[in-house]
């Protein structure tokens, strides 16, 4: 027998004692606050790691993930054992409600909150997502004392964490309370929210930590156990196919039941493994030689070596070759699975389902008879292994049992965006936690772009005090804005509503000279009015001088009193002696004193509403470029004011490609986009014309640098552009190809997750958000 395996089996051997209480069934002897558990001379430590997008990755990406996981297995320390666990745990309903449901505030929006909460509860009461998955890696080692064990864990935990992080899997060490919480949720299914544990308080009162997690009763039968009011069964993988698909573990853990699947791994030093395989090969060759000698003695000189001997020789040579030339390691492994049910009948049915999945992969998943207690301890993420049905595998063969499936997005306090199309779990993201909170919502007409944006607005309006500002070129947001108690400002040449293009808040310029920044804005405005590139150097100097003179008294008064207007600016130009000043004044007269002077008068609308919509549908071709600049500058003023109040601002720009058709509004938006995070703001661009959008270098840069994207159904050319820009695989592209409204991909930071979303149509919120003619008629 291999020395490492022999030592491990010897060290793991424990003296059996008959348990006198339910607490005695839990084999933990001692715990420390940092999460180190002791069992005899063995110590263990557990990490929790997140899932990654393996199921929908491209073939090349899957290969890269597989190789990275193989490297993790190869790096396992030969002096320890490792357990990789997938935990299907029941969703903690009370904790879920605290994290995502919106509490009432006693205002006019409580009706909307009630509808929104009902929608969320419908999503999680659906049987397909009442279970959530967690993944753990438990390292265990035999040491003389806890100090030696901690020194070992400091090294190995850091190495495992860094390798998992390299695979984009977030990793965290679990402390004692975290580990006990996992055990509590398993032993006491249905009581997840009742876990309370304080190690110091327990020590002070002389209570055992086992009292906080143990079930009320535990009874072990031949092929199952009864725990509290639940039935459970432990299975193990007895027979392995010659070729196993990498989806088997995912399929086994897709059962919507409380279950844990664990893979115990004992790595073998390469020199021992090579020596063992050389001895095995020598034994096989000896058997072949003896067989041939017997045939020769019978004068049978042309006999062919029997198939079974030839196969033994071939497999042994292949494994020896793997160990010596392909950087493979020898591992001993055992796969155990424990699942729970409400009744014996349900348990038997679930067992048959699991066994049929294994049979589909030509493997045999067998019940542990008379070993249910040992199997349970082995399946839980404790660090113990009491099942000796070990299988010899290479790194590559073991890596096929890969524990990854689909990346999840769940940010505490975030916004609900839909359900993961693979796992059916809710997607909850907080854009403010990203490197920047800027976003784009992209899709063909009818794919649900506006609805996705409105749904986010509704969530923010109901759950936060943040400000929401919308630029609406199609006049479609009025029902929602007014329904949420906001204000819509119609802007056109004939509208009585006016926004002063020269409004300036205190703090404009972010510490820089505000007049300089406003001068740049007015230069852009004048060039937009007169024509790009038509302002001479002298005219620019005159504009800069007049800007400073117009604002002098206003700034000296501490930004109090009447704010200058474009009409004041026009009058100041006329007072200048230079001919260039008169030329500029004449050129902009149409927009200051003429029929298009809607932005040349004092602001006469309330731009302080918490939810504000600028309706620019009727601006007209001549006023649109100027109107875009003025509205963006007005929004910039609002963002500055909100930053002083420590209030977040959310900006939504529908049909954003319109802004990129005009150089100055595009440049102003680009500058604003870069500053959003600094000003506690998040910008969202909405567009269906992606090909046109990406023709602008400015738009392409903004899109590439936005951390959050919602991609709905896309046209063929747009899909190709997005795939190149965002490195989206063909498998992922299938989720934005000829799909129904409300389906697509969400890019959140580095994660790209397929999603599906639907909203109950009978609700008032839906009627406020929908733009479908059939819904509106109804």
Task: Give the ranges of each region predicted by the language model.
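Conserved P-loop NTPase
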Residues: 726-778
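Post-Walker A helix-loop "phosphate-sensing" segment adjacent to the P-loop in P-loop NTPases
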Residues: 459-469
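P-loop NTPase motor domains
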Residues: 52, 59-78, 89, 253, ...
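Hydrophobic anchor at the beta1->P-loop junction of P-loop NTPases
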Residues: 441
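Extended, folded cores of ATP/NTP-driven motor/assembly subunits in large transport
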Residues: 1-404
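Conserved lysine of the Walker
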Residues: 449
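Hydrophobic positions on the alpha1 helix immediately C-terminal to the Walker A/P-loop
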Residues: 452
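A short helix-turn-beta junction within AAA+ P-loop NTPase domains corresponding to the substrate/partner-engaging
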Residues: 485-489, 698-711
């Amino acid at each position: 027998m291999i020395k490492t395996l022999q030592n491990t089996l010897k060290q793991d051997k424990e003296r059996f004692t008959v348990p006198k209480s339910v607490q005695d069934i839990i084999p933990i002897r001692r715990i420390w606050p940092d999460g180190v558990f002791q069992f005899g001379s063995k110590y263990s430590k557990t990490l929790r790691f997140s899932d990654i997008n393996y199921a929908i990755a491209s073939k090349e990406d899957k290969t890269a993930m597989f190789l990275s996981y193989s490297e993790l297995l190869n790096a396992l320390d030969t002096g320890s054992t490792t357990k990789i666990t997938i935990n299907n745990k029941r969703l903690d309903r009370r904790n879920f409600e605290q994290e995502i449901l919106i509490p009432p505030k006693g205002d006019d929006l409580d009706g909307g909150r009630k509808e929104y909460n009902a929608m969320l509860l419908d999503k999680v009461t659906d049987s397909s997502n009442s279970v959530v998955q967690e993944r753990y890696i438990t390292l265990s080692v035999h040491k003389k004392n806890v100090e030696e064990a901690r020194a070992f864990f400091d090294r190995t935990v850091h190495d495992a964490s860094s390798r998992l992080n390299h695979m984009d899997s977030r990793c965290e060490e679990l402390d004692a309370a975290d580990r006990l919480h996992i055990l509590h949720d398993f032993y006491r299914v249905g009581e997840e929210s009742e876990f309370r544990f304080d190690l110091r308080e327990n020590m002070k009162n002389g209570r055992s930590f086992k009292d906080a997690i143990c079930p009320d009763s535990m009874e072990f039968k031949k092929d199952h156990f009864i725990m509290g009011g639940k039935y459970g069964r432990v299975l193990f993988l007895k027979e392995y196919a010659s070729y196993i698909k990498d989806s088997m573990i995912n399929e086994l853990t897709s059962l919507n039941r409380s279950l844990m699947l664990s893979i115990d791994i004992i790595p073998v030093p390469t020199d021992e493994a090579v020596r063992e395989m050389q001895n095995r090969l020598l034994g096989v060759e000896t058997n072949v030689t003896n067989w041939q000698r017997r045939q020769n003695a019978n004068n049978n000189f042309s006999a062919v070596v029997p198939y079974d001997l030839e196969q033994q020789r071939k497999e042994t040579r292949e494994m020896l070759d793997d160990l010596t030339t392909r950087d493979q390691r020898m591992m001993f492994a055992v796969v155990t699975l424990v699942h729970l049910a409400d009744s014996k009948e349900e348990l038997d049915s679930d067992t048959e389902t699991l066994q049929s999945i294994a049979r589909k992969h030509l493997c045999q998943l067998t019940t542990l008879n008379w070993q249910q207690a040992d199997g349970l301890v082995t399946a839980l993420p404790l660090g113990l292994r009491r099942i000796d049905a070990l299988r010899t595998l290479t790194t590559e063969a073991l890596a096929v049992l890969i524990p990854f499936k689909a990346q999840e997005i769940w940010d505490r306090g975030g916004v609900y965006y839909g359900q993961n199309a693979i796992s059916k779990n809710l997607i909850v993201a907080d854009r403010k936690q990203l490197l920047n909170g800027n976003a784009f919502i992209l899709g063909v007409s009818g794919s649900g772009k506006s609805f996705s944006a409105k749904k986010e607005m509704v969530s923010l309006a109901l759950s936060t005090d943040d400000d929401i500002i919308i630029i609406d070129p199609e006049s479609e947001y009025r029902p929602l804005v007014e329904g949420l108690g906001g204000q819509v400002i119609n802007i056109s040449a004939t509208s009585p509503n006016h926004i002063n293009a020269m409004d300036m808040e205190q703090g404009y310029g972010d510490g820089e000279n505000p007049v300089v920044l406003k001068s740049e804005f007015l230069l852009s405005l004048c060039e937009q009015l007169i024509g790009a590139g038509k302002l001479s150097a002298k005219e620019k100097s005159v504009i800069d001088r007049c800007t400073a003179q117009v604002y002098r008294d206003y700034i000296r008064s501490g930004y109090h009193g009447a704010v200058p207007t474009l009409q004041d600016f026009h009058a100041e130009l006329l007072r200048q002696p230079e001919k260039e000043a008169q030329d500029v004044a004449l050129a902009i007269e149409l927009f200051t004193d003429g029929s298009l002077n809607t932005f040349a008068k004092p602001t006469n609308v309330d731009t302080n509403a918490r939810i504000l919509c600028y309706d620019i549908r009727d601006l007209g071709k001549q006023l649109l470029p100027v109107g875009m600049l003025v509205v963006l500058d007005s929004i910039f003023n609002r963002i500055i004011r909100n930053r002083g109040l420590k209030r977040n601002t959310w900006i939504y720009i529908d049909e954003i490609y319109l802004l990129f058709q005009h150089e100055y509004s595009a440049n102003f938006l680009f500058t604003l986009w870069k500053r959003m995070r600094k000003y506690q703001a998040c910008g969202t661009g909405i567009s269906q014309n992606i090909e046109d959008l990406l023709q602008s270098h400015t738009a392409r840069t903004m899109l590439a640098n936005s951390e959050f994207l919602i991609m709905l159904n896309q046209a063929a050319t747009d899909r190709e552009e997005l795939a190149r820009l965002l490195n989206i695989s063909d498998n992922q592209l299938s989720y934005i190809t000829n799909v129904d409204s409300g389906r697509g991909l969400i890019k959140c930071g580095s994660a790209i997750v397929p999603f599906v979303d639907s909203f109950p149509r009978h609700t008032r919120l839906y009627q406020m958000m929908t733009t479908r003619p059939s819904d509106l008629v109804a």
